[in-house]
UniProtKB/Swiss-Prot annotation:
The keyword rRNA processing does not apply. It comes from Bacillus cereus (strain ATCC 10987 / NRS 248). Belongs to the phosphoglycerate mutase family. BPG-dependent PGAM subfamily. Catalyzes the interconversion of 2-phosphoglycerate and 3-phosphoglycerate. Substrate binds at residues 8-15, 21-22, 60, 87-90, 98, 114-115, 183-184. Pathway: Carbohydrate degradation; glycolysis; pyruvate from D-glyceraldehyde 3-phosphate: step 3/5. The record marks H182 as: Transition state stabilizer. This is 2,3-bisphosphoglycerate-dependent phosphoglycerate mutase 1. It catalyses: (2R)-2-phosphoglycerate = (2R)-3-phosphoglycerate.
Length: 245
């Protein structure tokens, strides 16, 4: 049996401020740092170990992974970073307060932008200072590859391309894998693994920094999945609460 661990980064500064984040490279809040330490302690207490780790090129996911691996005495394992594991790109909404945006555009419109799978938010323009084309971490990308906005389908497409080219072969070779990433990235993976419908993924919420374990067969089909706490597996349908750590 193959085990895969997925973890959404700890609370970020913009999670705390209720802002659309997307590809903006904000760091963890103090609470997020604590959540990451707790996740590492949970995995260590439950006897988990890893051979390789995958993450995005955004510091909130990278730092979460660093902290988790440090808590597990696994800081030495290989870590692969790729933009294809970045959060969904929220276009011109990035940096805006979610409540203020709802007042401006209406709650229904903002809900559609956030939760529908195939509707993109308003795009950035190429002269917008938030456009990432000049960011050195994306220098290998061609202009057309760098998004100006994304819907969940767009995010899923790039995430699954990386899954099939890099992560799935690693799992099939017998390596123990952890992925530290973002809410919509993990939603995309869960949708694929569990073969969720569009309606099913719309209501799916991924909590910050709670280890989500998938048990997979040799063909990487899911047998079952569950969240982990200090006391072990959490009953299906329940999400453990964070403790001060």
């Amino acid at each position: 049996m193959i085990k895969l661990v997925l973890i959404r980064h700890g609370q970020s500064l913009w999670n705390l401020e209720n802002r659309f984040t997307g590809w903006t490279d904000v760091d963890l809040s103090e609470n997020g740092l604590s959540e990451a330490r707790e996740a590492g302690a949970i995995l260590k207490k439950n006897g988990y170990t890893f051979d390789v780790a995958y993450t995005s090129v955004l510091k909130r996911a990278i730092r979460t992974l660093w902290i988790v691996l440090h808590e597990m005495d696994l800081a030495w394992i290989p870590v692969h970073k790729c933009w294809k594991l970045n959060e969904r790109h929220y276009g011109a909404l990035q940096g805006l307060n979610k409540d203020e945006t709802a007042k401006k555009y209406g709650e229904e419109q903002v809900h559609i932008w956030r939760r529908s799978i195939d509707v993109r938010p308003p795009a950035l323009t190429e002269d917008d200072p938030r456009y990432e084309m000049n960011d050195p971490r994306y220098k290998a990308l061609k202009k057309g590859e760098l998004p100006l906005t994304e819907c969940l389908v767009d995010t899923e497409k790039r995430v699954l391309a990386y899954w099939h080219s890099e992560i799935a072969p690693s799992l099939k070779s017998g390596e123990k894998v952890i992925i530290s990433s973002h809410g919509n990235t993990i939603r995309s993976l869960v949708k694929y693994l569990d073969n969720l419908s569009s309606d099913g993924v719309v209501s799916l919420n991924i909590p910050t920094s709670i280890p989500l374990v998938y048990e997979l067969d040799d063909n990487l089909r899911p047998i079952r999945h569950y969240y982990l706490s200090m006391d072990g597996e959490v009953p299906e349908g329940e999400i453990p609460k964070h403790i001060s750590f």
